[in-house]
Amino acid sequence: MELDEESFLDELMSLRRDGSAPWQAPPYPGGGGGGGGGGMMMSDLLFYGGDGGSAEARGGMDASPFQELASMAAPPPQHPHEEFNFDCLSEVCNPYRSCGAQLVPSEAASQTQTQLTPLRDAMVAEEETSGDKALLHGGGGSSSPTFMFGGGAGESSEMMAGIRGVGGGVHPRSKLHGTPSKNLMAERRRRKRLNDRLSMLRSIVPKISKMDRTSILGDTIDYVKELTERIKTLEEEIGVTPEELDLLNTMKDSSSGNNNEMLVRNSTKFDVENRGSGNTRIEICCPANPGVLLSTVSALEVLGLEIEQCVVSCFSDFGMQASCLQEDGKRQVVSTDEIKQTLFRSAGYGGRCL
């Protein structure tokens, strides 16, 4: 015989209509009555109907009808942590509904994981899709929320760690780490180049009214126009065309080479001055040939002249100014012309110095 809610209530109401003596039994210990003489209420019957130790708790009440109902019902729950189930749509608690098959916590955790696996896969796929879209559009790090689902303690922590790992692995370099983007670095380099060129332009143009970019560019344009007008004015004053100016520049460049050769030839100089008492002043200017200084000093030693003071320059040409004194025991008379010819030959020139 199976009992459901309706048959159970009908059986209880039929017993109440009979008005038998057991309904007036003494109250159970710890009853709700203040004076201890009240009868058993319907709530007491419902909550104590499935208790294994109800005979002692009711204090000797004749419970033969209830024992029959308890014998026909299923045994009480085996786990002490399980409680009675309540139906939110029912007015009466059914203590026997919880006596059915219950799931062990490990089985419940595995069932929860099985149910949440499709949802987690869907979330991972959606996260990857959103990450790809963000990379295509140049977005930053992912801002998707992290959810934690119910179930076993170990399963929930593993699932939460897995979801966080998926969410954080799409964009390893986020804006939270302070790493600037490539567009920002390129913009900074562009602005730096622009500022450097504006500073260079500002240093070239003599007339700058203000220091902002617009004024610098405007003053530069006006200065270029002014230079163009000045060039036209000078061309009109000279009376030559630009083609003629180019021809003149070409002729000037070709003639400059000959002038340089003439300057080199005319720059050779050998001066010897006798100041008396064996003191001689020498001044030499010639092209800087290799070994010209050593050959000049050797020639002066051969002539018996001792250098007391000397200044040598080798920038473009070889130049030497020296003050010499006649050595003791040498020839007493050495003419200036002889000194000049000796220095001329020591510098690498043949013939005589005119």
UniProtKB/Swiss-Prot annotation:
According to the UniProt record, where is the region Helix-loop-helix motif?
192-227
Q: What does this protein do?
A: Transcription factor involved in defense responses that functions downstream of RAC1 and upstream of PAL1 and WRKY19 genes.
- Which terms under GO biological process does the entry name? defense response; regulation of defense response; regulation of DNA-templated transcription
Quaternary data: Interacts with LAX1.
Q: What are this entry's molecular-function GO terms?
A: DNA-binding transcription factor activity; protein dimerization activity; sequence-specific DNA binding
Gene name of the record = BHLH3
The opening ranks of the lineage are: Eukaryota, Viridiplantae, Streptophyta, Embryophyta, Tracheophyta
Conditions for induction: Induced by sphingolipid elicitor and chitin elicitor, and a compatible race of the rice blast fungus Magnaporthe oryzae.
* Localisation: Nucleus; Cytoplasm
Q: Which domain of life is it from?
A: Eukaryota
The record's listing under InterPro entries reads: bHLH-TF_ACT-like_plant (IPR054502), bHLH_dom (IPR011598), HLH_DNA-bd_sf (IPR036638), TF_AMS/ICE1/BHLH6-like (IPR051358)
* Organism expressing this protein natively: Oryza sativa subsp. japonica (Rice)
Region span, Basic motif: 178-191
Q: Which residues form the bHLH domain?
A: 178-227
Residue numbers spanned by region Disordered: 124-143
PTM note: Phosphorylated by MAPK3 and MAPK6.
Protein family (similarity comment): Belongs to the bHLH protein family.
Q: What is this protein called?
A: Transcription factor BHLH3
Q: Which SUPFAM superfamilies match?
A: HLH, helix-loop-helix DNA-binding domain
Q: Which GO terms describe its cellular component?
A: cytoplasm; nucleus
Q: Does the keyword DNA-binding belong to this entry?
A: yes
Q: Answer yes or no on keyword Chaperone.
A: no
Q: Which UniProt keywords apply?
A: Cytoplasm, DNA-binding, Nucleus, Plant defense, Transcription, Transcription regulation
